[in-house]
Design a protein with these regions (language model features):
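A glycine-rich, hydrophobic/aromatic-adjacent loop/helix-cap motif
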Residues: 1-93, 259, 267, 277
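Short coil/turn segments at secondary-structure boundaries
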Residues: 4-10, 37-44, 204-208, 232-237, ...
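A glycine-rich phosphate-binding loop feature that marks nucleotide/adenosyl-phosphate handling sites
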Residues: 40-51, 206-221, 238, 360
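A cross-kingdom feature strongest in bacterial/archaeal respiratory oxidoreductases
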Residues: 64-180, 215-392
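Alpha-amylase-like alpha-glycosidases and glucanotransferases acting on alpha-linked glucans and related
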Residues: 176-191
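Non-catalytic, well-ordered alpha-helical segments in soluble enzyme domains
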Residues: 187-204
Length: 392
């Protein structure tokens, strides 16, 4: 028989989260079925629609972004560390790197006060830059902490094109309403800024956002036609709003690592050895005490003062932190799931407003009881907006 080891993405979102993934790969290698149909290992099945699909990827209309002239970077989880320690050093993948001294933060298209792992610490670090600029349609925690907020349009206030690599559909997304208040498209905001910096023509090429959309699509139309793929011209797409392209994305015989299994010398993996590495000499040479050159078990951090273990899954009623305003219409607080035995031991009941805390911070939540939650474990979905009082 065949065995597929299916691993949830969530395992990495913990201290030493690399190890369970690595060990799962080792186990799959020991079973000897990597590269066979129905065998091996997979990640994130059921998370999004195209995971595990035996399909090619479609290349839709794209905007040429050029090359970023700045090669330096930091891991995204180290934003607070960087702001709090300008010029300080840190370890990353065996390298000793140095934090830059950031004077200005310009944030467009994200919300760090949702996805950062320690919001109280980020809140402190956010005071260090001289200027923070944010594009936002909503009055988020990030926008509230900016020096300058450029009100940006939503997808309903601008035109665009939509497509996905694993889907044969392409959409024209027409502007539905006029921009609310002083809101502008991100492109128009940057266009006006480029004018202030005397480089507007270089940035815009004298084209509006709608003209860019048409030109990008026309280039895609020509490339598709040259490849024998028939797609609608731009004006027809605008009339129909969407199209299912005449391209067959199915590829029934696709098996991950099939070619590697057949001929590992001709089709090496992207590891230093080109093989599945149960032991990694490269990682061993990093000389990190808790990360040897092989997957290992590290005891979880436990504190007798905080006996409950918190899980933070994705919410069923929001997309990450989006749509929070709609949730607040029915419940102003996040919901904490707890086993009835743990609730009885603490004298609390379903629907109670409770305070949750540890050494890093605290929050309020509405209690919900579930027999399916293990005793000693509680669950509160991610996505509630950061809104601390004077005590944090």
């Amino acid at each position: 028989g065949r065995t597929l080891i299916s691993i949830s993405w969530s395992l990495q979102r913990a201290r030493y989260g690399e190890h369970p993934f690595w060990m799962a790969c080792v186990l799959a290698a020991m079973l000897g079925q990597i590269g066979l149909p129905g065998g091996g290992i997979g990640f994130g099945y059921g998370a999004i629609g195209n995971i595990g699909k035996t399909a090619k990827r479609m290349q839709g209309p794209l905007f040429e972004q050029g090359t970023n002239p700045i090669s330096d970077f930091i891991p995204v989880s180290r934003i607070a560390d960087m702001l709090l320690n300008p010029g300080g050093s840190y370890n990353f993948n065996g390298e000793k790197r140095v934090y830059p001294d950031i004077k200005l933060v310009y944030w467009c298209g994200g919300n760090p006060f949702h996805h950062h792992q320690d919001l109280n610490r980020l809140n402190k670090a956010w005071q260090y830059p001289e200027t923070i600029i944010v594009h936002e349609p909503w009055w988020t925690a990030t926008a509230k902490r900016a020096d300058i907020v450029f009100p940006a349009t939503t997808q309903f206030e601008r035109s665009d094109i939509g497509w996905a690599k694993g889907d044969p559909y392409i959409f024209y997304m027409p502007q539905m309403i006029s921009p609310v208040g002083l809101a502008k498209n991100d492109y128009d905001i940057f266009s006006e800024l480029s004018g202030k910096l005397n480089c507007k023509e270089k940035f815009t090429h004298n084209q509006s956002s709608d003209e860019w959309i048409k030109n990008i699509y026309d280039k895609f139309y020509k490339q598709s036609k040259d490849q024998g793929i028939m797609v609608l011209n731009f004006e027809t797409l605008k009339e129909k709003n969407f199209e299912r392209m005449s391209i067959d994305l199915n590829e029934e015989d696709y098996v991950p690592f099939k070619d590697f299994r057949k001929d590992p010398l001709a089709h090496p993996l992207g590891t230093p050895s080109g093989k599945i590495e149960i032991y990694s000499e490269k990682i061993a040479n990093f000389n990190y005490p808790e990360i040897p050159g092989h997957p290992t078990y590290n005891k979880p951090f436990l504190d007798k003062n905080f006996p409950l273990r918190l899980l933070s899954p994705q919410p069923h009623d929001k997309l990450h932190s989006q749509l929070q305003a709609a949730v607040e219409d029915t419940n102003d607080y996040a919901v904490l799931m707890m086993n009835p035995k743990d609730a009885n031991a603490r004298g609390i009941s379903r629907g109670d407003l409770i305070k949750i805390w540890n050494s890093r911070g605290s929050c309020l939540a509405t209690l919900e009881l579930k027999e399916t939650i293990l005793p000693g474990v509680v669950s509160m979905a991610t996505g509630a907006w950061f809104s601390p009082d004077e005590d944090g």
